[in-house]
C-alpha cells in the first residue's frame, strides 16, 4: 500500500505474524478475509502526554512531515472536537500515479481507563474525484492511545486498505508494512512540538489509575487547519503544499 493510507481495522481472522521489532516498536501483519492484501498493526511505546499525541494526530497541516509518503492533508469538515472529514494525498513513487483519500475520523475516550480510540472510516464519495489522482477505494482503521506508567503511552496503529488502480500485490503489501513502520518510527521525533497542548476534551490519567495528576485543561482549538471556505483539490495542491513546506522544522 502506498504510504500514509489509513486502512481498516477489521477484528477478523488470521494469526498475526511479526515483521519488524525494535526496543519500542513492533509491527505485525495478517491475512485479511477475501483479499490478498494484508492487514497491518504497529504498536509503539512513546513518552508523551495524551494531549500531545492528540494534538499531533489532529494537526493536518503538519501531517506531511511525519506520516510516511504523505503529500499533505486538509480538513474538509468538522463536527465539534470528536469528528472530522479529512482529505489527504499520497505521494506514490514513480511511475505510479499519486493516490488521494477521504476519510472520517471519530474520537472517543474511555472515562475509566483514559484509553483514546480514533476510528477511521472510508468516505471516497464525500469529495468529487480529481483525475490527477487515483481515489483509494477501500481503507479504514484505528489509532489507539493507551496510557502506561511514568508518562509513557502505548500507541497502536492498525490498518487495512486497497490502494486502487493496478499495483502488484507484493508491492502493496510491502508498502503497507513500510508505511506503518516509518510513520510510527517518526512519531516520537515530532510529538515534542505539542508538549504544552491541552484540551478539555482529552483527559490525562489521574491518581485513580495510579499515575500523576492530570494536566490542567484549557480550551484548545479543535482540528487544526480547518477550512472555512469551500475546498477544492486545486486549492489544496497550489496553496497547502506551499504552506506545508514553510512549516518544515
Predicted segments, located by residue:
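Bacterial N-terminal signal peptides that target proteins for export
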Residues: 1-3
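Eukaryotic helix-grip
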Residues: 12-249
